[in-house]
Amino acid sequence: MERWWFNSILFKKEFEHRCGLSKSTGSLGPIENTSESEDPNINDMKKNIHSWGGRDNSNYSNVDHLFGVKDIRNFISDETFLVRDSNGNSYSIYFDIENHIFEIDNGHSFQSELESSFYSYQNSSYRNNGSNSDDPHYDHYMYDTQYSWNNNINSCIDNYLQSQIFIETDIVSGSDNYSNSYIYSSICGEIAGSGIRTRTDGSDLTIRESSNDLDVTQKYRHLWVQCENCYGLNYKKSFKSKMNLCEQCGYHLKMSSSDRIELLIDPGTWDPMDEDMVSLDPIEFHSEEEPYKDRVDSYQRKTGLTEAVQTGIGQLNSIPVAIGVMDFQFMGGSMGSVVGEKITRLIEYATKKFLPLIIVCASGGARMQEGSLSLMQMAKISSALYDYQSNKKLFYVPILTSPTTGGVTASFGMLGDIIIAEPNAYIAFAGKRVIEQTLNKTVPEGSQAAEYLFQKGLFDLIVPRNPLKSVLSELFQLHAFFPLNQN
């Protein structure tokens, strides 16, 4: 367990104008004043705050960082904090982010200090306009300071979990009422038994790793999705609503087939096909690690899918379409006999019903556990597409996502009337590792990225996820596929 010392105050927005702060409350920079701290642990920091609540001899000093969204990440564990008020009295605060617990032990006089400060401010503020209790939030802070502390901490936690780690603190609150409160603090942490000391320095908070950092990271890793490009963390709960785009660099991360269907197909119009079709073990593939059937079963439990592709009929901006979406999370999106059969049946249905066709590709290629049966799916799908495109003159759009490799690239992935790729998608026939091991040559960086291949003419469009649905809708209407409800 870690022990932390910090001087703290509960600070409302309106105090900024009365106390003459040199910087706004939305800033993470230091706040200057002339008073000196009496705490030997933080005396050298020399970042102070002006008198608070009209008291020139205020001992609230060395107030440096906003304890809000940016700094909550340093306290993601159950820890006890020792808090010193302006009178030099110390109090124990228990902080449990997981269970939303914030308790002050022996905190009566500490809360009284807060109430006194708020009372002083309230009198000076309301005396000028002749009102004492017009503000409904005044009573909230006056008579239930413990509640306001809990509210503030819970708000900090919730806002942090809905943002990336290095988000600017000025977007934490946008309301104009008085309920927004901040805790400004100067933190000097001391890990029990180790002698490692941490402190704030300027506008950057430096925290050295403690012995339980790894455990804390593992404990909360299920809350985050790490970007493959910038390694930033994205809150998983809101990640889906952001189309799996990194909030920090905009990188397109992998999406599940269900999320893609939800992105492209109008709500309530999705009608799946061949959901009960599952893989057997046609060649009785032998594996010392895990039998093929057991591996398929494990992926079915993990993903909730029966195979690496979902096919069905739906509406895209009210335009009826046939769509197949591959899922890389199911055995790397590998194309086996079931995947090939489901896509072939989808194409045949679209041919019969004269529907436009979309196939979202995300695959590592043919499934080796099914041998030549998986390879023949390339020819089978291509044959069905020939009838769909050449004989029926219908419109097919493949969408190449990361990664699209192997047999999918060599067959239906590159047979579209208009081929669309996502930004930064990895598209290749043979992967980088296979090429380098086979030819003993280094593959140039970025030579298998969508932007480079677009310059070489391998596909027609690079479309981000945000406008993808509207782009497809315009393409379909250009090819005489119109919405059902159009007059």
UniProtKB/Swiss-Prot annotation:
A zinc finger (C4-type) spans 227-249. Its main location: plastid. It catalyses: N(6)-carboxybiotinyl-L-lysyl-[protein] + acetyl-CoA = N(6)-biotinyl-L-lysyl-[protein] + malonyl-CoA. GO terms for molecular function: acetyl-CoA carboxylase activity; ATP binding; carboxyl- or carbamoyltransferase activity; zinc ion binding. Its EC number is 2.1.3.15. Residues 223-487 form the CoA carboxyltransferase N-terminal domain. It is found in: Plastid, Chloroplast stroma. Pfam families: Carboxyl_trans. Its cofactor is Zn(2+). Pathway: Lipid metabolism; malonyl-CoA biosynthesis; malonyl-CoA from acetyl-CoA: step 1/1. GO terms for cellular component: acetyl-CoA carboxylase complex; chloroplast stroma. The keyword Transit peptide does not apply. The keyword Nucleotidyltransferase does not apply. One of its GO terms (biological process) is fatty acid biosynthetic process. Keywords: ATP-binding, Chloroplast, Fatty acid biosynthesis, Fatty acid metabolism, Lipid biosynthesis, Lipid metabolism, Metal-binding, Nucleotide-binding, Plastid, Transferase, Zinc, Zinc-finger. Binds 1 zinc ion per subunit. Zn(2+) binds at residues 227, 230, 246, 249. PANTHER family: ACETYL-COENZYME A CARBOXYLASE CARBOXYL TRANSFERASE SUBUNIT BETA, CHLOROPLASTIC. Belongs to the AccD/PCCB family. Component of the acetyl coenzyme A carboxylase (ACC) complex. Biotin carboxylase (BC) catalyzes the carboxylation of biotin on its carrier protein (BCCP) and then the CO(2) group is transferred by the transcarboxylase to acetyl-CoA to form malonyl-CoA. Acetyl-CoA carboxylase is a heterohexamer composed of biotin carboxyl carrier protein, biotin carboxylase and 2 subunits each of ACCase subunit alpha and ACCase plastid-coded subunit beta (accD). This is Acetyl-coenzyme A carboxylase carboxyl transferase subunit beta, chloroplastic. It comes from Panax ginseng (Korean ginseng).
